[in-house]
Amino acid sequence: MRLSTQNQFKGTIVEVDIGTVMAIVRVRLDGGDHVVTSSVTKDAVLNLDLKEGQPATVFIKASAVIIGVE
């Protein structure tokens, strides 16, 4: 599969927390202690059969990133 997304990070799923409609998926990136947390639909988790310990690639759309500071 080829994608236009430039921000691609390989890692391992460390947590899947499924709610009623949405789910939180945490992926520890390879080569460090950084964890990316993503909110996805429950259906996406079930369709992709996401499980802890499974390798995954995180794709981040640059125009959709929000950064905040205090």
What is each residue range found by the language model?
Residues 1-70:
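Non-catalytic connector elements of ABC transporters
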